[in-house]
């Protein structure tokens, strides 16, 4: 937006990336404001990704995940810097800003935040620097008075506002600015999301930043960029994802510089407390003091940033700010506390007084509020987030914006923070990411260690009223319920690590929900409390730390809101169920927070669309919701963040989350820390099984929340998320058990996936992408992947949402999955419709993806979202989510094993590539036996592919694909496709692109990517595909797989397309296969495993089914000698042969990857099929299967899917298990690919085959992997997988099972991801 433009220079100054990101964000952000920012991960990350890329590929994941294992540091850090800064500016202009971005960014963020940040510029700009810049540039200058700002700002810069603002926010600020300093620059991105965590930190006073997270980061931040702290704790895992992207560059570059400058300031910031004098000195600032605390810090930050970009920023923002001032008033209205107005002209008056007060924690309530503990919160309310959502929002819903800001920010911040802590925004979101910000934020409050305490203020969240929210939410909502509820467990880990924040986040999540209702009262309370809170806030800051967690919860809640909102849109009932259980919903949101962070941005975007719906669901939050839609986007970015964060953060921690236990770090979060995962799982569970659905909102959003999760996760897919959530939401009922059970799977999927992705922290990049996906799906897969599971569940939805924000098509996918039970046909129809819708919307996704390309990670997230979306459908969707995660796994690993993800894509491209292929796919798919489905898959896929090409398009397509694949029997194909597509698109595109190759990454994201894929293998593949397609629906799938495998190997981006294509065909294949699968499922797996998997092994297994088809196809593809394998399966055989051609033909090197990809796809397909079978049978099962698929793909996810399916059916289990083993092996193979070539692959395959046939024997599977060169690791994974699969199988339906699976998945995922990373 204007801010953006303005910001851009600044950004440029700060960082080209930032600018890019910024404007991306602006565009995105501005667009959806949150969509992008929130979606940042998705959108900006794309653009930003470049910068982010540098920072962390998965901006989505907060690529910065990588710093944290995945997200947190990267994310949070980045986020902290970027996000935090963003959050800062987005958050509440000053608080967060200075907190995160002591410097320019901050300031502008701040100002906008405070000033009008939210009002107009911030809304759009808030997230965007543009807005923020505006806001805060103006805020600084325009804020109360530009001169003060300028001068103060300058002062700040000179004085190092941090100090200045240090005094302002003596306690908070210092921390805060420390954080702020660190974060300051980053604000540029869309703080909104991140603002949350950052906000929290900022808000909280950066202590948060400063605090544990902050502190850890602090050094890091200081070290890192200074922003790190903020970033980190911004943990924009989610938001960062989005803004984080923005900020990433900022952080990375701009921010770093700013950081450098800002950081210095921040250094001063903490030290800056001394700078207090500055504050005084900055009387002008002082005027901004209230602001200044934010503003000053901002100023200082801004100055720093602005120092660098001061002119631009300032002038830019000056004008903007001025506007913001106007906005500010609006904000002021909105948040009297906000003190934006205060900042605005009033501030001048207040300022001096305020200044002293500012310096004193108890400045005038308004000021203080804003400034002090609460101020952070206050600012937060006033933060652009509120505005960010939109000036109107701000205006119209001062409260809302405030609330939303609060929610969002808290979410973001929390999420970021938490996520960050969890490292997985998911972030983990479950992220991308994402945001466990909700949790983070909330959690952060709780997490003292999270010195997010300072951030807590960010909990402005609670105080729509402004600070009150801080107090209210923080105190009332968060602290009490959230904090206590989840915090406890979360906090335990929290203090120690970011991870703990993860738990915090999650734990907070559920409580957040409580607060949700509180929200409204809260608002009132907030106002009352605002003052109270100001005082309280300081207290609360600690509390706020807790609250931050709570805030995260709030964020989650918000995310969930966002998710729910979307779900609500789609599935109001579920939404409500999801939503309000708010609590749970919040949990979901929380989950969503993380995921929402990512998703939330989307959500916000979506929220914008869905805002109203969201509102409905979240009545109280509604204010936020409706208006916060944008905010949601923000928060959802938190979900996205969650995803990203979750994906990223969660991916790590969240990833760890489920297997928090698995992951030591997450373990603390473990229960809670699973933040996403755990929280998903735990918070999900923690909130109570009852909440589980809601909490499972993470689950819900996860499974039952598949949709929810999807939504959450769809942060990146954010859009899809809501849809998915909605769609999934419906499944929740279906999924109710399934959701619960499946959902758990989902949580697993999300968590597990995240975990897997998490496991891919190493695969961070990939994990970012893969992890993101992995976060949700890939967790380990990549930053994106972690979220993918998160997303994945809603990926489709998410994708859809992304693509078709409101498309609903995605919803359909979810619905489809919901239909899952219905006939395949129904699913197919739905899938078809979905696909179509996706087709329509995919462009959106595409755009995002395009943006995301750089943001591949984000894209992954989105892909994940797709996966999520796919996963959204419990079975199919979820599974696709699972698949996607698997892809992410491969994707993440693909990062490690780019080919895995990538291959996915390419194969699709061929199918898709042939424009007709799509049709053919359709036809094939139809032919496949699932005409409806295949068509859906095909059509969807085609669309999806395109989408995938875009990268985010993938979500739509992915979604479609996933939708179709997961949804329908085709879904399985799609699933594989999705997995591959997701993996490829997400993994391939995102991961492939991100992981596979930056270039491919982008390429993958872009059409070129799939074009490339096609070009790679696709060129050939299309024929294959055509043949395969023509040959058989199964073939279609297989060929795609093969193609995709081939392509994947060939190229990262290629796989994207291929994946799509693959998805299409596989969908059909699976579709067709699905029926057979059901019938011949048992056979399929064996054959798939034996013959399919081991192309050479031949069709003996004769799992001619789609699964086998896929398997065969995959094996064929990768086995090269697939011919023999697919003979077993007619369709498969055909596919296989072509695949074989593709696969075998591809270089051995590619071969392994290709195989992997093929396998993954195959597995996905199989899963899909298994799922499908169950899908028809049980949505839940499918969902779980989907998770399993994801897991399997991740190595774990698939297994999980298998398990779920297994429970459902031994065949499924076997298939899944085998697949998983296969997957693992394949995966590893790709990793091994280098290590092991085609021969190894074959060899591995053979063992696989054995394992697959013996899939029942976990050992066998295990052994099989062991056989692999990489087998050992895969074996482990497999083993775990298998075991878990068994577990899951036994308990697949049960949530416990899911958790187990999730843990397993996480563990495996982690391991797997790690392994992959290692291999890679």
Swiss-Prot record:
- Highest taxon of the lineage: Eukaryota
Residues with the modification N-acetylmethionine, per the entry, are 1
Chain intervals with Gly residues compositional bias: 582-596, 701-710, 769-784, 1118-1128
What keyword terms does UniProt attach to this protein?
Acetylation, Activator, Chromosomal rearrangement, Developmental protein, Disease variant, Intellectual disability, Nucleus, Phosphoprotein, Transcription, Transcription regulation, Tumor suppressor
Composition-biased stretches (Pro residues): 338-366, 498-514
Q: Does the keyword S-adenosyl-L-methionine apply?
A: no
Expression across tissues is: Widely expressed in fetal and adult tissues. Highest expression is observed in fetal brain and skeletal muscle, and adult skeletal muscle.
Q: Which regions are flagged for Low complexity bias?
A: 202-214, 291-309, 523-550, 564-578, 759-768, 798-809, 895-905, 973-984
Q: Name one GO cellular component term.
A: nucleus
- Chief location category: nucleus
Query: Bias category Basic residues: which stretches?
Result: 98-113
Compartment list:
Nucleus
Keyword check for Acetylation, yes or no.
yes
Query: What does this chain do?
Result: Transcriptional activator which specifically regulates expression of TBX22 in the posterior region of the developing palate. Required during later stages of palate development for growth and medial fusion of the palatal shelves. Promotes maturation and normal function of calvarial osteoblasts, including expression of the osteoclastogenic cytokine TNFSF11/RANKL. Necessary for normal development of the membranous bones of the skull. May play a role in tumor suppression.
Summarize the subunit comment: Interacts with PBX1, PKNOX1, ZBTB24, E2F7, RING1.
Protein name, please?
A: Transcriptional activator MN1
From which source organism is this entry?
Answer: Homo sapiens (Human)
């Amino acid at each position: 937006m204007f801010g953006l433009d303005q910001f851009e220079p600044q950004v440029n100054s700060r960082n080209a990336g930032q600018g890019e990101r910024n404007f991306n964000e602006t565009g995105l952000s501005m667009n959806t404001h949150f969509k992008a920012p929130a979606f940042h991960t998705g959108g900006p990350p794309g653009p930003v990704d470049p910068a982010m890329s540098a920072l962390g590929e998965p901006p989505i994941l907060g690529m910065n995940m990588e710093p944290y294992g995945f997200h947190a540091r990267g994310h949070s850090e980045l986020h902290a810097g970027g996000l935090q800064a963003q959050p800062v500016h987005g958050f509440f202009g000053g608080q967060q800003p200075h907190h995160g971005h002591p410097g320019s960014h901050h300031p502008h963020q701040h100002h906008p935040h405070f000033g009008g940040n939210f009002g107009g510029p911030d809304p759009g700009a808030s997230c965007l620097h543009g807005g923020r810049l505006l806001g805060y540039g103006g805020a600084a200058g325009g804020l109360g008075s530009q001169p003060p700002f300028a001068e103060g700002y300058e002062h700040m810069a000179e004085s190092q506002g941090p100090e200045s603002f240090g005094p302002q926010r003596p306690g908070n600020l210092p921390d805060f600015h420390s954080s702020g300093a660190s974060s300051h620059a980053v604000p540029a991105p869309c703080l909104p999301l991140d603002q949350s965590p950052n906000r929290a930190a900022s808000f909280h006073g950066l202590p948060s930043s400063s605090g544990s997270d902050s502190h850890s980061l602090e050094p890091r931040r200081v070290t890192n960029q200074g922003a790190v702290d903020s970033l980190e704790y911004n943990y924009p895992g989610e938001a960062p994802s989005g803004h984080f992207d923005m900020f990433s560059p900022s952080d990375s570059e701009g921010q770093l510089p700013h950081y450098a400058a800002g950081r210095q300031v921040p250094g001063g910031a903490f030290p800056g407390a001394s700078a207090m004098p500055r504050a005084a000195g900055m009387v002008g600032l002082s005027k901004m003091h209230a602001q200044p605390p934010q503003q000053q810090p901002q100023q200082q930050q801004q100055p720093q940033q602005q120092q660098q970009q001061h002119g631009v920023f300032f002038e830019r923002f000056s004008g903007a700010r001025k506007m913001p001032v106007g906005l500010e008033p609006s904000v002021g209205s909105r948040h009297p506390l906000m003190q934006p107005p205060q900042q605005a002209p009033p501030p001048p008056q207040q300022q001096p007084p305020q200044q002293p007060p500012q310096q004193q924690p108890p400045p005038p309530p308004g000021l203080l509020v804003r400034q002090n503990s609460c101020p952070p919160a206050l600012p937060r309310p006033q933060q652009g987030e509120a505005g960010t959502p939109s000036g109107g929002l701000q205006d119209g819903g001062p409260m809302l914006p405030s609330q939303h800001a609060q929610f969002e920010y808290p979410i973001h911040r929390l999420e970021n923070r938490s996520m960050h802590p969890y490292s997985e925004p998911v972030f983990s979101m479950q992220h991308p990411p994402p945001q466990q910000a909700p949790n983070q934020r909330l959690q952060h409050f709780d997490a003292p260690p999270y010195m997010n305490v300072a951030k807590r203020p960010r909990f402005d969240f609670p105080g729509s009223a402004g600070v009150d929210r801080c107090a209210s939410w923080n105190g009332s909502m968060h602290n009490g319920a959230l904090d206590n509820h989840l915090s406890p467990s979360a906090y335990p880990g929290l203090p120690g690590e970011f991870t703990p924040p993860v738990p915090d986040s999650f734990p907070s999540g559920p409580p957040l929900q409580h607060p949700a209702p509180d929200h409204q009262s809260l608002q009132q309370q907030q106002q009352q409390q605002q003052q109270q809170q100001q005082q309280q806030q300081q207290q609360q800051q600690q509390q706020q730390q807790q609250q931050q967690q709570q805030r995260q919860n709030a964020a989650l809640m918000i995310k969930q809101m966002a998710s729910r909102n979307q779900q609500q849109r789609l599935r109001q009932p579920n939404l409500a169920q999801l939503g309000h259980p708010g609590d749970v919903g919040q949990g979901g949101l929380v989950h969503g927070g993380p995921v929402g962070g990512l998703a939330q941005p989307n959500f916000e975007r979506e929220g914008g669309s869905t805002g109203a719906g969201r509102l409905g669901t979240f009545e109280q939050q509604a204010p936020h919701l409706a208006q916060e839609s944008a905010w949601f986007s923000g928060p959802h970015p938190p979900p996205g963040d969650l995803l990203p964060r979750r994906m990223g953060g969660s991916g790590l921690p969240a990833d760890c989350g489920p297997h928090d236990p698995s992951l030591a770090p997450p373990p603390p979060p473990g229960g809670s820390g699973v933040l996403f995962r755990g929280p998903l799982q735990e918070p999900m569970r923690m909130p109570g099984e009852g909440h589980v659905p809601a909490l499972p909102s993470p689950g819900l959003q996860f499974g039952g929340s598949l949709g929810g999760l999807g939504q959450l996760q769809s942060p990146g897919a954010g859009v899809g998320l809501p849809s998915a959530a909605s769609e999934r939401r419906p499944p929740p009922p279906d999924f109710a058990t399934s959701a619960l059970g499946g959902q758990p799977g989902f949580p697993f999927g999300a968590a597990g996936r995240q975990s897997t992705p998490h496991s891919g922290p190493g695969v961070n990049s990939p994990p970012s992408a893969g992890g993101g996906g992995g976060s949700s799906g890939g967790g380990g897969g990549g930053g994106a992947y972690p979220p993918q599971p998160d997303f994945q569940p809603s990926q489709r939805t998410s994708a859809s949402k992304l693509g078709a924000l409101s498309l609903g098509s995605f919803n359909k996918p979810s619905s489809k999955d919901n239909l899952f039970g219905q006939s395949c046909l129904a699913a197919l129809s739905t899938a078809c419709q979905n696909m179509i819708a996706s087709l329509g919307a995919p462009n959106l996704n595409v755009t995002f993806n395009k943006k995301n390309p750089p943001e591949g990670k984000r894209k992954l997230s989105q892909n994940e979202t797709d996966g999520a979306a796919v996963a959204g459908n419990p079975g199919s969707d979820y599974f696709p989510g699972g698949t996607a995660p698997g892809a992410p796994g491969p994707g993440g690993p693909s990062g490690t094993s780019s080919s895995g993800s990538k291959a996915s894509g390419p194969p699709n491209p061929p199918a898709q590539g042939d424009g007709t292929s799509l049709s053919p796919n359709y036809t094939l798919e139809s032919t496949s036996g699932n005409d409806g489905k295949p068509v859906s898959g095909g059509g969807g896929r085609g669309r999806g592919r395109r989408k995938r090409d875009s990268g985010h398009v993938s979500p739509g397509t992915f979604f479609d694909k996933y939708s179709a694949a997961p949804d329908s029997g085709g879904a399985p194909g799609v699933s594989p496709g999705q997995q591959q597509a997701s993996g490829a698109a997400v993994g391939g595109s995102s991961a492939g692109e991100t992981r596979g190759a930056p270039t491919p990454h982008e390429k993958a994201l872009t059409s070129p990517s799939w074009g490339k894929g096609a070009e790679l293998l696709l060129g050939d593949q299309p024929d294959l595909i055509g043949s395969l397609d023509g040959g058989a629906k199964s073939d279609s799938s297989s060929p795609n797989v093969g193609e995709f495998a081939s392509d994947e190997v060939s190229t990262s981006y290629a796989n994207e397309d291929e994946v799509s294509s693959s998805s299409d065909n596989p969908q059909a294949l699976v579709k067709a296969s699905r029926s057979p699968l059901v019938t011949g499922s048992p056979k399929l797996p064996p054959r798939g495993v034996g013959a399919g998997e081991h192309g050479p092994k031949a069709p003996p297994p004769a799992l001619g089914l789609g699964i086998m088809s896929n398997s065969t196809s995959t094996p064929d593809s990768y086995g090269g000698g697939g011919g023999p394998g697919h003979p077993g399966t007619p369709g498969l055989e055909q596919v296989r042969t072509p695949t074989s051609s593709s696969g075998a033909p591809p270089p051995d090197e590619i071969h392994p990857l290709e195989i992997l990809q093929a396998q993954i796809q195959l597995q996905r397909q199989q899963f899909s099929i298994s799922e499908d079978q169950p899908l028809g049978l049980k949505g839940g099962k499918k969902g779980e299967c989907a998770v399993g698929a994801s897991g399997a793909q991740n190595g774990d996810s698939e297994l999980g899917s298998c398990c779920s399916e297994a429970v459902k059916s031994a065949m499924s289990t076997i298939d899944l298990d085998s697949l998983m083993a296969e997957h693992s092996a394949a995966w590893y193979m790709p990793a091994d690919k280098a290590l092991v070539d085609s021969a190894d692959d074959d060899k591995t395959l053979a063992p696989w085959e054995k394992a697959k046939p013996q899939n029942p024997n976990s050992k066998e599977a295990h052994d099989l992997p062991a056989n692999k060169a990489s087998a050992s690791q895969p074996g482990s994974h497999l083993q775990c997988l298998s075991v878990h699969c068994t577990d899951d199988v036994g308990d697949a339906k049960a949530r416990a099972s899911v958790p187990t699976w999730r843990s397993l998945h996480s563990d495996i995922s982690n391991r797997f991801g790690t392994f992959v990373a290692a291999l890679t």
